[in-house]
Amino acid sequence: MTALDIQISVEAGDWPPEDELQSFCERVLEAAADFLAREENQPLPAQAAELSLVFTDDQSIRAINAEWRGQDKATNVLSFPAFPVTPGRMPGPMLGDIVVAHETLRREAAELEKPFDAHLTHLLVHGFLHLFGYDHIEDDEAERMEGLETRILARLGLSDPYGDQPPH
């Protein structure tokens, strides 16, 4: 497994206890990093790559979204790469920050009829890919990123979040 140094902070929202969240996030993101290294030949720093995860609520993520993206609305996840990076290039020792909003996550999970943990896993993987330079603005980029998300989630035993197919 690829080593990550994951720092978490629960700022607001009805999240699970920090120790449970820490273990959960380590399992998900270590699997994602391992997948990128093995399947996509993504180079990783020799030392444990650092990233921070902030678990918050809709009010907080709305303020962050307005400040950094000019969108005055809550969203499910935001990612802030520490350094500009292109997929396949060596990232810096600090990958960046991922911020997740509890209410939006819970509402979307209910709408999608998915377990909370499954949707959280998807959002963590999605945010993590952004830290490596993946994006979904252009159709071809979105297709590539969604394909990676689907394959990583399948490795974790979860179905395709963009379709109704069970994992292979």
Curated annotation (Swiss-Prot):
Cited InterPro entries: MetalPrtase_cat_dom_sf_prd, YbeY, YbeY_CS
Enzyme Commission (EC) number: 3.1.-.-
Cofactor: Zn(2+)
One cellular component term from this protein's GO annotations in UniProt: cytoplasm
Any one Pfam family match given in the protein's UniProt record, by short name: YbeY
Signal peptide location: none
Keywords recorded for this protein, A-Z: Cytoplasm, Endonuclease, Hydrolase, Metal-binding, Nuclease, Ribosome biogenesis, rRNA processing, Zinc
Name the record gives this protein: Endoribonuclease YbeY
Provenance organism: Rhizobium meliloti (strain 1021)
